Amino acid sequence: LPTLLKKASLFWFCLVLSSQLFADPQSSNLGAGVSPQRALLDQYCVACHNQGIVNSTTVDGESILFSQLRGLGLTLDTENVDNVAENPEVWEKVVRKLRVGIMPPPDNPRPDNASYAAFRNWLETELDRASSTNANPGRTQAFHRLNQTEYRNAVRDLLDLDIEVAEFIPPDAPDQHGFDNNAEVLSLSPALMERYVSAAHKVAELAVGATPRSTTIKTYEVPLNLIQDDHLNDDLPFGSRGGAAIKHTFPVDGDYRIKVLLQTNYVDFVRGVDQAHEMEISLDGERLGVFAFGGDAPGTPAPYSYAGNIRGSDDWEEWSMAFAEGGFEVNVSVNAGPRTIGATFPREMWEPEGILQPRLFGYHLAVTELPDNNPSVGAILIEGPLSVDGPGKTPSRQKIFSCIPASADEEPSCAREILSTLARQAYRRPVDGNDLQGLLDFYTQGRSQGSFDTGIQFALERLLVSPDFLFRIQQDPSGVGPGDSYAINDLELASRLSFFIWSSSPDAELLNLAEQGLLRNQDILEQQVRRMMNDERASAFIKNFVGQWLYLRNLDSHYPLPAAYPEFDENLREAFQRETELFIGDQIHADQSILKLLNADSTYINERLANHYGIPGIYGSRFRKVELDNPQRAGLLSHGSLLTVTSYPNRTSPVLRGKFILENLLGSPPPEPPPNVPALEETGNDGRILTMREAMVQHRENPACRVCHAAMDPIGFSLENYDAVGKWRQEFANQPIDASGTMPDGRVFDGPAGLRDLLLDQPDDFVGTVTEKLLMYALGRGLEYYDMPAVRAIVREAAKQDYRWSSVILGVVESDPFRMRRAQL
């Protein structure tokens, strides 16, 4: 009986609630003497967001929607909208929901668009006014560990040594916003500390040129589905096709063995051996050897192993011996340091076009893997050193050994000079006697066990595991009260700036200015930002910020289903990523408006990508900037990179695409879906393949899903003309694609061009989201409600300069959250 009473009570409560939801807004008694803002909330919002719902108890059988409202905890009936300073956190949440008009939910009364926009603008203005009298710059973590990329770059700039960082330390997981430089998730476990200790030892050995304890073999694999019919790399000879060029750091001067393996499929079959071919191996562009193989070519063919008759055909029996496992080898004397090893095929006047299909487990071999197609490079192996001639004159040794002691008496002073120089850059601050003595103690220990170089190696190992190197450390200065805001010092500002733009330590110029206390000067700070953005190290900004903001990093782990999209290969994957990186990098360096991301009529493509997009007249593997005359390819939203990572392996997903745009371009991420959401039905009851729109109509029958999908789905459907690998199409399931949509606020649009216009119609929302992402990345923390006034201030100033990239980046650097910090409470 009690349960029955509870259900009855819930029924009557929901009945009353629904009558409020669907009441005629004009008939509501708004009350006398209330503000327009209070009246609007009472009329359109309080029916769902009130303390009665929030404080109600859970009842068996209640709807998911009712549970969601309770869990949201939003009580707009008790919040004082006339004084938003009392609870700015709540009102910033409201502002975010108002961005795309997601509230009130579909089919509920809502204000007219003018009233809606006026209420949002009023809220933002009041929040900004309240913040101006009590600004909170937020608090970054006191200990901010370098992530994997930052560690690699810091080692590179410190020692002039580019390491394969993945061999030493694992990648870092991104935070909830998609960035892997958030201090809160960059913890240091005992196991990870062991990896850093091991990495320090190996890096120090390599940097000083210590003789390796044993011969090693390093293997560089070439992706199986990389098509090698064209010239692929500028480090390979002009007029060659396919192959690979890899960068390898040789530890010492000496003899090494270079071995090249041909690409095989999943049963070790090597293609192309019925024709005569040549393989060329080079070192830094100089030919080391040419090997003839295949057909009746002279020379030593690759070793064979028998694999049997695959299908019983006479033709296959004839070629069943053509399995290469031994590869091609050359021994060479190499000077220590970074070198480029190339393996490629000299291009013939005419040769067949080979297409290596991806692995199709469970299927027969593709016809394009028959033996009369082009061979390709599968791996390059470096073995050595087979003999050692000495440490050599490597860039890292030249960077480390700023002095060479002529006698034992000169060694202590030389060691002090070397270590003080390295420590200053590694610790990103001036070093004192205690810093230096700790390193000299390790130098002395190493010197007693070997040479002067060994002593420096020991000290370098100690430096690379120091908390001052592995962490960016910020401490509250003395004299600052709990919770007070203060300006960070120039050295902290230098590190914050360099890790924002370069993902690395400050260089000498930046450190010198910081030590002199000049960096906080606004003119000097702006000059440094522009200098750094024009430095080649700023490529890290494109790679890391853009790569994570726009999910480009996800391309490496995204595999469209070969049976559905056989045209997708490694060449296309690389072209997708390169296009977006070059596209955005060009706009930043040209200081264009951020809005150009959406409607630019140019992009960067090569022949492979041009063919995929249907753009004629582009030849060769080199990327070049092209003007577009087809609006289907205008702007970022037409890039294959974004369209692929926001699709499933076997089909497009309006939900993923809509969610991506809401979260990353409009700053209005939808909440997580309720548990146990069923998968989309791909066929109807009659067995007919459903269009995506038909499948989503069924899905939205759940009221708990309808609210979020009201905004996600129209945006996602606008891109439905692009398939799951970004190719334009007019039909799906033998039916014309409907790419039209209506936003919750009533705005109607059609296709990608309509979506672009929709985004450009409210530029502050798009630029504001880019600014939020930039500020998150720059600070290494998520943004809070108290950061939003600073974001809006940056956007307002940027609007005066047509939202140019420089105005937003400089706005971030000059903002209170970037230049200030709040003391521990």
Language-model features, listed with the residues they occupy:
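N-terminal secretory signal peptides that target proteins for export/translocation
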Residues: 1-6
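Bacterial N-terminal signal peptides
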Residues: 9-20
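Aromatic- and Gly/Pro-enriched helix-to-coil junctions and flexible linker segments
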Residues: 21-224, 230-234, 281-284, 342-406, ...
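Histidine-centered active-site/metal-ligand motif
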Residues: 49, 339, 709
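Extended, folded domain segments that form the structural surfaces/walls around functional sites
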Residues: 211-243, 258, 308-309, 317-320
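Long, His/Glu/Asp-enriched segments that create or flank divalent metal/ion-associated functional microenvironments
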Residues: 234-240, 244-264, 269-271, 276-285, ...
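Surface-exposed loops/turns
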Residues: 252-253, 335-336, 433
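Beta-strand-rich ligand-recognition modules
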Residues: 265, 274-340, 344-368
